[in-house]
């Protein structure tokens, strides 16, 4: 990330970065046949994955974690995740839901 002195410029830079993130959303089978929703492609150096995961867990009323550069949510939330990420400022066009 380039060095930015003005806080307003830094905020604008983060907004531009959000609009450029290619995000992939898919499900995986976890232990005992349970399903988890995986969100990857969000740059963990620029964004706090823990904070994003916390907001998503609250909105979806589920458990989850942020680890290994991706967010894992308990359950299948593919139908709602695109709208929620768009509300957080990510471009809906760059969110791929499988």
UniProtKB/Swiss-Prot annotation:
MF annotations from Gene Ontology: mRNA binding; translation initiation factor activity
GO biological process, one term: formation of translation preinitiation complex
Domain of life: Archaea
InterPro entries: DENR/SUI1_TIF, SUI1, SUI1_arc, SUI1_arc_bac, SUI1_dom_sf
Keywords carried by this UniProt record: Protein biosynthesis, Translation regulation
Keyword check for Nucleotide-binding: no
CDD domains per the UniProt record, alphabetical: YciH_like
HAMAP family per record: SUI1
Family (UniProt): Belongs to the SUI1 family.
Annotated protein name in UniProt: Protein translation factor SUI1 homolog
Organism: Pyrococcus abyssi (strain GE5 / Orsay)
